[in-house]
UniProtKB/Swiss-Prot annotation:
Belongs to the bacterial ribosomal protein bL21 family. It comes from Mycoplasma mobile (strain ATCC 43663 / 163K / NCTC 11711). GO terms for molecular function: rRNA binding; structural constituent of ribosome. GO terms for cellular component: cytoplasm; ribonucleoprotein complex; ribosome. Part of the 50S ribosomal subunit. Contacts protein L20. The keyword RNA-binding applies. GO terms for biological process: translation. HAMAP family: Ribosomal_bL21. This is Large ribosomal subunit protein bL21. Keywords: Ribonucleoprotein, Ribosomal protein, RNA-binding, rRNA-binding. InterPro entries: bL21-like (IPR028909), bL21-like_sf (IPR036164), Ribosomal_bL21 (IPR001787). It holds the Pfam family Ribosomal_L21p.
Length: 99
């Protein structure tokens, strides 16, 4: 059984016992989370979402991704700027798909 959920402005294909990395959501490790924006479950397609369909998971970890370096340089001048960014994420284990 598989489903497509929407979270953090992205659509993610999930299966039971999968680990997914999503944009940070509030909660601590070990806390259950329910995704109710389900677009598809097996052969059922929502318009845009399915009613009475949920995906349940448990938060495994809150963390930050690897640092990316953003470098800005203006041509014909000595202006340079170097920035780093680490995007926060949440790792979730999918426990159950209902629908």
């Amino acid at each position: 059984m598989f489903a497509i959920i929407e979270t953090g402005g992205k659509q993610i294909l999930v299966k039971k016992d999968d680990f997914i990395f999503i944009e940070k959501i509030e909660g601590e490790a070990g806390q259950n989370v329910v995704f109710d924006k389900v677009l598809l479950v097996d052969d059922k397609i929502g318009t845009p979402f399915l009613k009475n369909a949920t995906v349940t998971g448990i938060i495994e970890k809150q963390g930050k991704q690897k640092k990316i370096v953003v470098y800005r340089h203006n041509a014909k001048s000595t202006h340079k700027r170097k920035l780093g960014h680490r995007q926060p994420y949440t790792r979730v284990k999918i426990l159950e798909i209902k629908g």
